[in-house]
Design a protein with these regions (language model features):
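Short loop/turn motifs that connect adjacent beta-strands in outer-membrane beta-barrel proteins
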Residues: 19-28, 65-66, 107-115, 160-164
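Outer-membrane beta-barrel translocator domains and adjoining extracellular loop/strand segments
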Residues: 41-48, 81-87, 128-137, 179-186
């Protein structure tokens, strides 16, 4: 992890020194993305594996052509339909998150067309709906779960035009602190996003 953070800092310093190639573009943009993959829901002595699908709506501020900051809203939907050793199944949970991220794009695959990007940040998450059904069909519902995570992305972005960018990423979120009950650990998500710079 220390090596990864040092690498990001090096990329950041290089990115901040880059000259603006598209000075006529606004420093503001938006991003819409969706992802799907495996996740683990833990809490109250449970560890349930399942699938999660996510959507994100982000606002971007381009500090330079290589570095941008992002914040917005993410929605995560978790589902586990198989019987586990603890006799829990039909588990459904919905989490809302507010991320603050910094994204670096430095290593160009094709000049001014495609680049490898790295993103890291912090994210506050809260369960807005949680339902756990047991083997005897009893149910428990909770909406008080709150946890902090570190979202990370690595992927490739391709410029469709001066304004539009299409990205493909491998994403994860490492849980760092849980305040109540349940938390969602993303083991590895495939994410697709479209960015528009004003």
């Amino acid at each position: 992890m220390k090596y990864f953070i040092c690498t990001l800092l090096c990329v950041c310093s290089l990115g901040l020194s880059a000259q603006e190639d598209n000075a006529f573009l606004s420093k503001w943009g938006i991003e819409f993305g969706a992802s799907v993959g495996r996740a683990q829901l833990t809490g109250n002595e449970l560890a349930l594996n399942g699938m999660t699908s996510n959507g994100n709506w982000l606002v971007s501020y381009y500090a330079t052509e290589r570095v941008r900051f992002q914040t917005g809203i993410t929605m995560s939907f978790f589902s586990n339909g198989s019987l586990t050793a603890d006799n829990y199944y039909n588990t459904n949970a919905t989490f809302i998150g507010i991320p603050v991220k910094i994204v670096f794009s430095k290593i160009e695959i094709a000049p001014k067309k495609a680049a490898i990007v790295l993103g890291i940040g912090v994210q506050a998450n809260k369960a807005i709906n949680y339902q756990l059904e047991t083997k005897d069909f009893s149910k428990s519902t909770s909406s008080g779960s709150v946890f902090l995570g570190v979202p990370m992305d690595i992927g490739v972005e391709s410029k469709l035009s001066d304004n539009y960018t299409l990205g493909f990423y491998l994403s994860t979120q490492v849980v760092t602190k849980s305040y109540k009950n349940y938390r969602l650990q993303n083991n590895g998500l495939l994410r697709v996003a479209v960015s528009y710079r004003f």
